[in-house]
């Protein structure tokens, strides 16, 4: 992809992950911090970032390198092994099944609504916004898992929660310092988390079956 972009002058928008911070527990995260991937997935994202930045510096390929923080929202598959936590929890709640929380629920995430991610990516494409290195894509809203569960119980009053041992490789806390994001995309305002969560619940209730169990084939 990068080689084609070098040859054609195409603008590359690459999706990386906040998981590249890994062992760095300092909060909030900013783009100048040291990186310490804790999983092969995170390491692969960091390696890809290196290629993107190398093509930008060596060949002047226009690039926008976005580090996503816990993206959620409609059309996200809720039922596979690596499903994101929010659609997975909502899907289980819809089936009347308990949700699993690894740890005591005091872990935090800087959730980012997919609508906001789309706005950022489309603006970068249309206005040719590039980054000098990576840019964290989250607005600094540190949401604790227990608070998220309390919000979900407004939609699923009988929701049951199983608290389990922490998993090896899980990041306990996540929060972005959004200064660079706001300076590059000043016109974009994220939807409040609870409103975005409610929209996600409504979408999964109406359309969840269409994305569960993988892609469908037509006869």
Give, region by region, the residue ranges found by the protein language model.
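NAD(P)-dependent short-chain dehydrogenase/reductase
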Residues: 26, 50-109, 114-123, 150-155
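Short, conserved glycine- and acidic-residue-centered signature motifs
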Residues: 44, 82, 174
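Conserved donor sugar-nucleotide recognition element shared by glycan-biosynthetic enzymes
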Residues: 40, 48, 82, 145, ...
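N-terminal Rossmann-like NAD(P)+-binding domain of SDR-like oxidoreductases, especially those catalyzing
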Residues: 1-71, 198, 202-203, 207, ...
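C-terminal substrate-binding subdomain of Rossmann-fold SDR/epimerase-dehydratase oxidoreductases
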Residues: 94-219
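Structural element of the ATP-grasp superfamily
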Residues: 1, 52, 89, 181-182
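Short, hinge-like loop/turn segments at secondary-structure boundaries
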Residues: 31-32, 81-84, 179-180
């Amino acid at each position: 992809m990068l080689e084609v972009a070098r040859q054609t002058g195409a603008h590359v928008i690459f999706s990386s992950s906040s998981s590249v911070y890994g062992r760095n527990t300092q909060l909030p995260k900013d783009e100048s911090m040291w990186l310490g991937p804790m999983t092969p997935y995170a390491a692969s994202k960091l390696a890809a970032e290196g290629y993107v930045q190398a093509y930008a510096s060596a060949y002047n390929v226009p690039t926008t390198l976005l580090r996503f923080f816990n993206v959620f929202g409609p059309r996200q598959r809720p039922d596979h092994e690596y499903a994101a936590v929010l659609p997975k929890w909502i899907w289980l709640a819809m089936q009347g099944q308990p949700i699993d929380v690894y740890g005591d629920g005091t872990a935090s995430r800087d959730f980012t609504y997919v609508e906001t991610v789309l706005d950022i990516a489309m603006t970068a494409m249309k206005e040719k916004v590039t980054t000098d290195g990576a840019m964290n894509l989250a607005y600094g809203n540190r949401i604790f898992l227990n608070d998220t569960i309390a919000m979900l119980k407004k939609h699923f009053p009988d929701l049951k929660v199983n608290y389990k041992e922490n998993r090896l490789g899980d990041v306990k806390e996540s929060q972005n310092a959004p200064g660079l994001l706001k300076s590059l995309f000043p016109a974009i305002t994220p939807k409040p988390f609870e409103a975005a969560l409610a929209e996600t619940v409504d979408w999964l209730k109406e359309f969840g079956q269409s994305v569960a169990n993988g892609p469908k084939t037509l006869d």
